[in-house]
Amino acid sequence: DSECLKEYGGDVGFGFCAPRIYPSFCVQRCRADKGALSGKCIWGQGSNVKCLCNFCRHEP
């Protein structure tokens, strides 16, 4: 999966992942800005969250 998933980059995780919309800003920006098929949010401790762009497959 490491070849498929690439972090969006910058400190965008919380802003891209916190709003409860579908599809998330993470998915929207990965598609629009990076040419990815989808994106997903990985939550860590507290507000530590990463937006990962998926270049291999569409995910809900």
Swiss-Prot record:
Gene3D superfamilies: Knottin, scorpion toxin-like (3.30.30.10). GO terms for biological process: defense response to fungus; killing of cells of another organism. Keywords: Antimicrobial, Disulfide bond, Fungicide, Plant defense, Secreted. Disulfide bonds join C4-C56, C17-C41, C26-C51, C30-C53. It is found in: Secreted. One of its GO terms (cellular component) is extracellular region. SMART domains: Knot1. The record marks R20, I21 as: Reactive bond. It holds the Pfam family Toxin_3. Signal peptide: none annotated. One of its GO terms (molecular function) is sodium channel inhibitor activity. Inhibits trypsin and chymotrypsin. Belongs to the DEFL family. Protease inhibitor I18 (RTI/MTI-2) subfamily. This is Defensin-like protein 4. It comes from Brassica napus (Rape).
